[in-house]
Amino acid sequence: MKRIFPVILIATIVLLSACSKSPEPTTLINCDGLITDTLGTGDNGRIYIPNAFSPNNDGLNEIFRPVTQNIAAIIFTIYDQNNVVIFTTSVLGYGWQPSLQASNVAKKYYYKIQATTASNKKIGLCGEFHSLTCFPVNPPRSFYYFEDMLTPNGFTGVTNESLPTCY
């Protein structure tokens, strides 16, 4: 028994030292520091943000912007895939309209929002969105929701956006 204990102890140490923590998922923008303190307060400030827009000069879903209700102030920032700020505004209702993109392009960008409601509460959001001049094969078209799909109940219905499929 006295000889087995050191063997078990050494084997356990070797096995534990061989284990490594799995890497954390990579997020290109830092969402730390965003504050949301509206939960459970009955505050009716809302921010709706699509996950796609189509700057293709067809007059539909050309601008990427948050749609707000009962929001008094906002800081809205957009980052490219290299974490470079490409747009920022503090004007409610204002959004990003990039120069016309080439056809058959699907690009991913990131946003960060810190807003103050009319009741002086905070809402912080961050995430990714897609600039589309065509629909990629994956994910399916149903993955994307555009500003024209927004109703008083959130994003419902079908977009009027008619884009070709990217190949």
Describe these PLM feature segments.
Residues 2-10:
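Sec-dependent signal peptide recognition
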Residues 12-13, 68:
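Alpha-helical transmembrane segments and their juxtamembrane interfaces
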Residues 22-167:
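Short loop/turn motifs at secondary-structure boundaries
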Residues 15-18:
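C-terminal motif of bacterial Sec signal peptides marking the signal peptidase cleavage site
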